[in-house]
């Protein structure tokens, strides 16, 4: 079965002449595209980007579940998470190691979704 996924973008068209436009570009996309029950997947090393924090607030306003892959302690993102959200902190401070772990986690997540939708494959 098909499973829709949309990559939110930092397209230059979202940036206006004000600094606020740079912060709110992800939240505006979440408001426009997100529906209750959807999942917002975030990947961040520091967990302190204002645009991501704003996107989490927008997701909660629209009743989305937030899955956040972060580095170290999760930063400010960790504080924004709700009970139904999922926070996975990679306990490392080097950005390259955190991103490598995020890549592995995304592959595992995709495999898990495939199993849920399609069942176990015979080897």
Language-model features, listed with the residues they occupy:
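Glycine-rich phosphate-binding loops that contact phosphosugars or nucleotide phosphates
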Residues: 1-122
């Amino acid at each position: 079965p098909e499973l829709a996924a949309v990559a939110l973008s930092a397209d230059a068209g979202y940036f206006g002449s004000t600094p606020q436009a740079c912060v709110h570009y992800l939240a505006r996309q979440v408001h426009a595209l997100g529906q209750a029950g959807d999942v917002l997947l975030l990947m961040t090393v520091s967990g302190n980007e204002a645009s991501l924090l704003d996107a989490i607030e927008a997701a909660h306003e629209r009743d989305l579940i937030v899955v956040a892959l972060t580095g170290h302690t999760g930063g400010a993102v960790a504080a924004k998470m709700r009970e139904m959200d999922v926070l996975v902190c990679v306990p490392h401070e080097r950005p390259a190691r955190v991103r490598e772990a995020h890549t592995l986690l995304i592959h595992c997540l995709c495999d898990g979704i495939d199993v849920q939708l399609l069942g176990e494959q015979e080897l």
